[in-house]
Curated annotation (Swiss-Prot):
NCBIfam families the UniProt entry points to: PRK00951.1-2, PRK00951.2-1, PRK00951.2-4
SS bond list: none
GO CC entries: cytoplasm
Record field: catalytic activity: D-erythro-1-(imidazol-4-yl)glycerol 3-phosphate = 3-(imidazol-4-yl)-2-oxopropyl phosphate + H2O
Lineage of the species this protein comes from: Bacteria, Bacillati, Bacillota, Bacilli, Bacillales
Enzyme class label: lyase
UniProt-annotated location(s): Cytoplasm
Gene label: hisB
Record protein name field: Imidazoleglycerol-phosphate dehydratase
Similarity field: Belongs to the imidazoleglycerol-phosphate dehydratase family.
Pathways involved: Amino-acid biosynthesis; L-histidine biosynthesis; L-histidine from 5-phospho-alpha-D-ribose 1-diphosphate: step 6/9
Main location: cytoplasm
Amino acid sequence: MRTATKTRVTAETSIELSINLDSAAESTIATGIGFLDHMLTLFAKHSRINLNVKADGDTRVDAHHTVEDVGITLGICLKEALGDKASINRYGSTYVPMDESLGFCALDLSGRSYLVFDAELTNPKLGDFDTELVEEFFQAVAFNTGMNLHLRVLYGKNTHHKIESLFKAFGRALREAITINPEIKGVNSTKGVL
């Protein structure tokens, strides 16, 4: 089974996270940050990954450490659960509309970490959530998974809708990339390793 569990404790946060890449069972997500919980729930649904997260962070300061550390821990678990990446598609891409907004994600589980984030998030806050943390989250995921991740909002007006389209697109593109393809023998690379 392609699963992973990680507990990550720092002076700023305590994160418990588990994933099962091959189960769409209902996820349990409690980060203490309502907007992040909402986005992770959407990600889990659209990736068809069972995701369980419990986070306790120094949110009295702000949400930055918790958001980043959840991203780090998710990336570590994705990397572990993918193992040697044998027979996975490796690549995934999709567009996702959310009302007036259109989000795009393309990714490569190459082992080489990179993030391109092109999204004009015009509202700096959604409730208490700093929208600049969306990029921080995806940076942490990409760099700890070993993923080349491109995210773009092509257009839109509502900042919530823009961010939601990105999380859904990320989930759907990741599902495509992690799907095992019986036509792929070994890893999907001429190098023989990812």
